[in-house]
Amino acid sequence: MSVYQQRAAELARLRREAIEEAHVGQGLTYTEIATALGITKGRVTQIRGGAPARERAFFGVGPVHVGVPLREGTDDRMRSYIDAADLATQTDTETLFGTLALAAEPFTIPSDTSTVPDGDVVVICGPKSAPIGADLMESDPCLGMVREHGRWWIIDKRTGELFGSPSTNDPPEPADVGYLSRRRDGDRVIVHVAGIRSTGSRGVLHYLARHLRELYLRTGDESFSLAIRCELDDLTVTDSSIVSGPHLW
């Protein structure tokens, strides 16, 4: 049933976007739009107020799989676990989806995972956590991650510019850097999130929760990547901003 509900929500979003395009792009009044569509102005108001926002399409149609790494323990029993910051990022993603009428389907990413699940997906995973993270970054023509000088960096593949986590500076600063890409893959969307540390991933979601609409208006349905710096109070993100991008592919 979730699939059908998500399709219905997407159809409502498309109706709302078409109405707004006619109003803003063509200069029609809502009364004129209602007349052209053969519906009442009240129905137009209902569509505008009740349908999901246009930026819902950033993540696809839904339901959306939301994956985080399953890490290997280092104690005697070698139990697998999910990092607290990764779990918080997964929860932040689900919270954001709640504002967009998107259904989330959480999953874990074992360390040997190389295949992206079918359908719309948010992969919260760095290149060192699983092959799926490394492969997605490898296919990004603009940004990636490299290990140099004993630490990890986000790299602009075209210029060689490096963006490191302030938390690994000497002295360390309460901040981190995260990576975000969004790509159209046939009839689905793959969003990839990765931090230099796991807190960097949460910084990406902090930014999306506050700037998704403006980012979607800038990038539309194009594939792109960007880097985000976030300020931290322990594991809590207090601010976030773009430091590179968005770079359209």
Model-inferred region functions:
Residues 1-18:
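Short, Lys/Arg-enriched anionic-surface-contact patches
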Residues 11, 19-28:
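Short basic helix-loop element that most often maps to the first helix and adjoining turn
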Residues 23, 37, 48-49:
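DNA major-groove recognition helix of helix-turn-helix
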Residues 29-35, 44:
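Short alpha-helical "recognition helix" segments of helix-turn-helix
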Residues 43-45, 58:
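Boundary/activation segment at the start of structured domains
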